[in-house]
Amino acid sequence: LVSATRGDGTTLQEALVAEGLAAVDSHGDNTAHTARLLELEEQARNAGLGAWGLRDLVVHSADPNALAPFLDSVQIIEGRVISTGAARDGRIYLNFGTDWRTDFTVQVMRRNQRRFEAAGIDLRALGGAIIRVRGWVAEENGPMITLDHPEALELVDAPEPARLPGR
């Protein structure tokens, strides 16, 4: 990864995101500047700048039928978590519909859950919350994103218990 800085101290990544020419795609091993980039992305999106204004960049709804053309690509998806669940192997699922076999789902593997806890996000308490997630959309009993770091999940509107006490 190359980090280029302009004369005013703004990084190239910040400039591209702020002008709506790029969306944030954070990775678990590279999250130091994600919060700032997400702020800039939201400002560009709300102002309809660059690709946001052209609708080349969009925040998709969690509708599985609408997501079908976007399988096998990185996308941003927003919706209400209808329920949460856990598998025997410790995976946590965030379900965006009543049928996990076809609806959009987010999964977090057991090995990554401590990162969410450390960030103050109680995944099991997200039922009813509206969240925005970003990542690779795969087909696994409907469209699914596997999150490995909390910076890829934004709480848009969360019920009070969605955050761990004291955070």
Model-derived features: positions:
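Small beta-barrel nucleic-acid-binding modules, primarily SNase/OB-fold domains
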Residues: L1-R167
